[in-house]
Amino acid sequence: MDARLLEIIVCPICKGPLHYDRAAQELICNADKLAYPIRDGIPVMLVDEARQTVEGTPVDPAGR
């Protein structure tokens, strides 16, 4: 994931910062508890494609 892109990309819902999870290949919004997938190096910033996360629980690379 390009560091410059990470500096400017925000959550499409709350416009807050996203955190890159390299192992899961996801961008995480802690405020909304959503994880946006990265497919072929491209962030998929569609709410319908995001999955719910649970704070304090490791992100599952399989997306469950």
Swiss-Prot record:
**Gene3D superfamilies from the entry?**
2.20.25.10
Which family is this protein grouped under? Belongs to the UPF0434 family.
Q: What is this protein called?
A: UPF0434 protein Bcen2424_2546
Sorted alphabetically, the Gene Ontology cellular component annotations on this record are: cytosol
Q: Which organism is it from?
A: Burkholderia cenocepacia (strain HI2424)
Transmembrane domains' residue ranges? none
Domain of life per record:
Bacteria
